[in-house]
Design a protein with these regions (language model features):
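Hydrophobic residues within alpha-helices
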Residues: 19-20, 106, 192
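NAD(P)+-binding Rossmann beta1-loop-alpha1 motif at the extreme N-terminus of oxidoreductases
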Residues: 1-61, 90, 126
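Rossmann-fold dinucleotide-binding core
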Residues: 98-180
Length: 208
């Protein structure tokens, strides 16, 4: 690990809190910022994270950013500040599940600002985040992938580059379709089992 790296983590909530904990345990310097809920921030500061009072302060001292936000709109709002304040060559790893059009626009803006923007939407949930068992679906330039992998390694069990920027969002969408379709199929199978007089609890154990 490069001890000169200073990570700014934006979105230390349900998914992000576990990621920050794992980054801290791996020895990274992590800076966090509060939004609505202070509890995760207070807990992370107690573990060694540094709290920043504003995005402006964070942009002036961090050379790597990880975004884990609830929507593309939130990402655009944050990046409007970061892209205007961050130093050239700053690496921005966006773990948000974004719309493809958002990724393309952020990539364009980052290039104009001489920043390195990478998309890395995640698979898994809160428990996987805490256990460092997330999956990262990365879309980026080839030369950025090694550094991105090293940064995300403490948080993720699987990190795969699917191609250039945009492929992360595309692959995550397909992954969501697959998960939703599988869940629907399971529900329908259980309903059919119940309707046909099959003990669905025993059937579930057999099928699991």
């Amino acid at each position: 690990m490069d001890n000169k790296n200073k990570i700014g983590f934006i979105g230390a909530g349900i998914m992000g809190q576990g990621m920050v904990q794992n980054l801290l345990e791996a020895g990274h310097e992590v800076n966090v910022i509060a939004h609505r809920n202070r509890l995760p921030i207070d807990e992370l500061v107690a573990l060694g994270a540094k709290e920043m009072m504003s995005l402006f302060d964070m942009a002036s001292c961090c050379n790597i950013f990880i975004l884990c936000l609830p929507s593309s709109q939130a990402v655009m709002s944050v990046c409007n500040v970061l892209f205007s304040r961050a130093l050239p060559k700053t690496l921005i790893i966006d773990c948000t599940t974004n719309e493809l059009i958002t990724v393309k626009e952020l990539a364009r803006q980052a290039k104009a600002a001489r920043l390195r923007y990478v998309e890395a939407p995640l698979t898994g949930g809160q428990q996987q985040s805490r256990e460092a068992m997330l999956g990262a679906i990365v879309g980026c330039d080839v030369e950025d992938f090694v550094m991105v992998s090293n940064i995300l390694k403490p948080c993720c069990a699987h990190i795969e580059r699917l191609g250039e920027l945009g492929m992360g969002a595309t692959t995550k969408l397909i992954s969501n379709f697959l998960a939703l379709g599988t869940a629907t199929l399971v529900v329908e199978a259980m309903k059919a089992a119940n309707n046909l007089g099959v003990d669905w609890k025993k059937f579930y154990k057999l099928a699991s």
